[in-house]
């Protein structure tokens, strides 16, 4: 009887992990194919709502990559002079910065021996520092549109970059 109970418990513990891996895999596939990016983002955000996943760096990486790809698609449209939503461009940029800051905070967590190994910081900081000025430009854009809440959010993100540990090597 105890053996049967142990089997059931292990099965119930295994199925959520399997579903989580499947969602991450599907999201990565969507990112690679550059489609269903909003679904990939929302599924990663749903996984992060579960307290068991708060420390899973793979989810944060996938979330950041989904938002990064959304931003790059809109950015490509601007460079190709195709119609694109400017407000969405700047809001996606802000979401991207927030996602990478969250990823960095998880990356900074010490391991079991108390050591901190920053695997992603340098690459992410270099990538984001190229687009930091667009936070400022987005703030100006929203001021001109009289959307002061969004302008404040973007300007605040621009200024906070100076104190974010993620950007300590770039500034």
Predicted features, each with a name:
Residues 1-29:
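Bacterial Sec-dependent N-terminal signal peptides
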Residues 54, 66-145, 153, 160-170:
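Short coil/linker segments at helix-helix boundaries
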Residues 30, 36, 43-47, 60, ...:
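Alpha-helical solenoid repeat scaffolds, predominantly canonical TPR units
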Residues 20-88:
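Start-of-domain marker
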């Amino acid at each position: 009887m105890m053996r049967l109970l142990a089997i059931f418990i292990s099965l119930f513990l295994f199925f959520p992990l399997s579903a989580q891996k499947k969602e991450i895999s599907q999201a990565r596939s969507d990112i690679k194919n550059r489609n269903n990016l909003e679904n990939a983002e929302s599924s990663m955000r749903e996984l992060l709502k579960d307290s068991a996943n708060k420390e899973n760096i793979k989810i944060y990486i996938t979330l950041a990559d989904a938002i990064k790809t959304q931003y790059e698609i809109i950015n490509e449209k601007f460079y190709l002079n195709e119609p694109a939503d400017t407000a969405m461009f700047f809001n996606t940029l802000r979401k991207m910065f927030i996602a990478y800051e969250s990823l960095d905070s998880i990356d900074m967590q010490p391991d079991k021996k108390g050591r901190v190994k920053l695997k992603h910081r340098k690459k992410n900081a270099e990538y984001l520092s190229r687009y930091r000025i667009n936070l400022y430009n987005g703030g100006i854009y929203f001021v001109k549109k009289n959307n002061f809440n969004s302008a404040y959010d973007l300007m605040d993100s621009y200024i906070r970059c100076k104190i974010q540990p993620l950007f300590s090597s770039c500034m």
